A protein has these predicted regions:
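Short, structured segments at the rim of ligand-binding sites
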Residues: 2-460
Length: 460
């Protein structure tokens, strides 16, 4: 069941609601204007929500800064509030105060109603097992870009000593005594499973060792938060994370790292529209793989202390061969926005998606807009991946440049939705992009930012 903005109204998260104007859920985009100007990106969606969950583990208040006003933050705020955490958010300052001193069990029906379209609820397991000895986790939402199983998560929790009971509408978990540290190797360096293990191990008894862990910058920032809270965690260079469990954790004060997915999305928009955009809050170190690719395609950038400027230098863009991967590779979430820019590159580009098996569904609408994109089951252009033998259309060949023309399109998922905005901005004529509230999940004030960059957009 998906939560609507109304669902949050009784909670103290009003400023997070964002667009609730009652207007139609669509944006008209008059394409053809190069994006130009300066915008700011705040904290990373895929870190902020996890740090908020981590606050549950502390005995004292936490303060998180640089928090964007996006729907995923509202969903997590709602769930934390239901469990007795006092949440106060100031959208203008981007500061969220979290007081977990009165944590309590929530009613199943309410949890279900507040889970929204997010995957974050699964990360409540460890903290709730430590705080309350039990947890109910509703069926998860999230973007339809693959099957997105949670088998690694459940295996981790079972090994720590939790009883996992799948019920209609969700999963009930119970701690059989104090959770105990484990030694485990992930079959794949999953971001969520690594976070699950971290949030559970920090207060489990004894040592936990995870091999083949994900080491995304958002995970490292979560580890920094947990260390501030009193955890003992080391990260080795070979994807091994070791955690010494402690009895108590306190609150934290932390400033979230910037959203490198949002930054790369705007950079791709600058490239696809022939524009010039400076992104405050974008940082080189977390975006190195993207910057290399941006340069290979023919885009230019300039790194400054507080921002990165991205622009199209004029002339043709170059086709590339690209493979998505876990960090430090090219992020899967950068793929969809960049593919739109690749429709404007000369020659054949090959993109091999190795993180999600179904992340090219969004290309249907791009084809409708004039792009020439073919999808293949084979692993093209790189080493075979785990999807190669499984019949998934996970490689794309993009032939360009092709002029894009306006169309009426429906947002399929968060990043695919932003890609449609980029395509509509690059296209000739007036496009209608429907279902834009999905984009609110991860892009703060995107309409205002579009307008600030000179885009001709209006709500339906
Ligand atoms: N996987 C399993 N079993 C599991 C968990 C994962 O097979 O129990 C598989 C997935 O099906 C997928 C792969 O492992 O094929 C990677 O999934 P991962 O667990 O790393 O992804 P996630 O934690 O569900 C987060 C982000 C995604 C981002 C990925 C990869 C959040 C809330 N989501 O998802 O972000 O694409 O890591 O970096 O942090 C987005 O922001 O639009 C988004 C989809």
């Amino acid at each position: 069941m998906n939560a609507t903005p109304q669902d949050y109204r009784h909670l103290d998260v009003g400023p997070l609601l964002g667009n609730d104007s009652g207007m139609n859920d669509l944006l008209y985009v008059n394409g053809g204007n190069p994006l130009s100007g300066t915008i700011t990106v705040r904290g990373a969606k895929n870190f902020v929500s996890k740090a908020m969950v981590a606050s549950l583990l502390g005995e004292t208040k936490s303060v998180l800064r640089n928090v964007p006003q996006i729907r995923d933050v509202a969903v997590v705020s709602g769930l934390l509030s239901l469990h007795g955490v006092q949440v106060e958010y100031s959208a203008a300052d981007g500061v969220i105060n979290l007081d977990p001193s009165a944590v309590e069990s929530a009613h199943v029906a309410e949890i279900d109603a507040h889970a929204g379209s997010s995957r974050i609820p699964i990360l409540f397991c460890g903290p709730l097992l430590h705080r309350l000895g039990e947890a109910f986790i509703p069926d998860l939402g999230g973007c339809h870009i693959g099957d997105r199983p949670i088998d690694f998560h459940l295996e981790i929790l079972r090994r720590f000593g939790a009883e996992v009971d799948k019920r209609e509408g969700g999963i009930h978990l119970r701690a059989l005594g104090r959770l105990k540290g484990i030694k485990m190797e992930l079959p794949y360096p999953s971001v969520g499973a690594t976070e699950q293990l971290l949030l559970t191990a920090v207060r489990a008894e004894g040592i936990t060792e995870l091999s083949n862990a994900a080491i995304e910058p958002e995970i490292v920032d979560l580890i920094c938060v947990l260390q501030k809270m009193g955890a003992i965690i080391s990260v080795d260079t070979d994807r091994v994370i070791r955690i010494e469990g402690v009895d108590r954790l306190t609150g934290f004060t932390h400033t979230a790292l910037g959203d490198r997915i949002e930054a790369a999305s705007w950079a791709s928009a600058a490239l696809a529209t022939g524009g010039d955009v400076t992104i405050k809050g974008a940082h080189q170190v977390e975006m190195m793989a993207f910057l290399n690719t941006f340069r290979k395609v023919g885009g230019q950038f300039e790194v400054h202390d507080q921002d990165i400027r991205f622009w199209h230098p004029g002339g043709p863009l170059r086709s590339i061969v690209l493979e998505t991967d876990v960090h430090p590779g090219f992020m899967t979430d950068w793929q969809q926005p960049l593919v739109v820019a690749l429709t404007q590159a000369t020659g054949l580009s090959i993109v091999h998606e190795t993180v999600y098996e179904k992340r090219f569904g969004f290309t249907c609408a791009l084809r409708k807009m004039g792009a020439n994109i073919q999808i293949y089951r084979e692993c093209l252009g790189g080493a075979p991946c785990r999807f190669g033998q499984r019949n998934f259309h996970h490689s794309a060949v993009i032939s360009g440049p092709t002029p894009l023309h306006a169309a009426d399109v429906e947002v399929p998922d968060l990043r695919g939705g932003f890609s449609y905005l980029i395509a509509a901005l690059a296209a000739n004529g007036r496009s209608t992009v429907r279902g834009i509230s999905l984009i609110d999940r991860g892009y703060e004030a995107f309409q205002e930012k579009l307008e600030a960059l000179g885009a001709d957009v209006s709500r339906g």
